Amino acid sequence: MPRLRRAEQVARNRDLLLAAARRVFLARGYAGASLEAIAEDAGFSSGVVYSQFGSKADMFFALLERRIEDRASQNERIAAEFAGADGLRELMRVAQEDAAAEPGWPYLLAEFRAIAMRDGELNRRYAEAHARTVDGIASVLESLYKPIGLEPPVPVRSMAEFVQAGAVGIALERAANPDALPDRDVEQLLLRALGLLDTAVASSGGGRRR
């Protein structure tokens, strides 16, 4: 196998480090994780880690940004195919699959948010990342209304903030009570809150874009 060019090697190392960071952060939490533990998980020296990331916070934000981008692309694909209530249901279905695959992510995010609240610079950086998340959700929600000729009952930005806050809150509630807020109830609550209940389509695929 030919040797990787330096730029390719740097990119490969970064991917491996971020994969290791995800594992360590999810297993130990933000406070319990360290760059040394992440380096060990990835099979690298600490020097390789510090050549890519200046701090644990830098690594966390890189991981968060990648997650934001991945989820935004995923949601955009769904919104391009579905509209109305069916679009919301499909977004929820995929979000539930993601949550099942990484059940610790909402707890990690909540932990980091609590830490960032007490650190002005961390809070500023987190607020910027959070705003991009909300912007992406707002854009996708807006696209659910246009094909069915409806106007959102409240500004889509407020809807997006409500949805994002609810997702983290539901995860935390279920940590204390796994039976809290069944998915079917959450679906009905969101359909009502977003003014999409009357657009619910009984037939399979009825909400696909034509």
Q: What is the role of each PLM region?
A:
Residues A62, S73-P106, P152, V156-V163, ...:
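Hydrophobic alpha-helical connector segments
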Residues M1-L16, G54, D58, A62, ...:
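Residues at secondary-structure transition points
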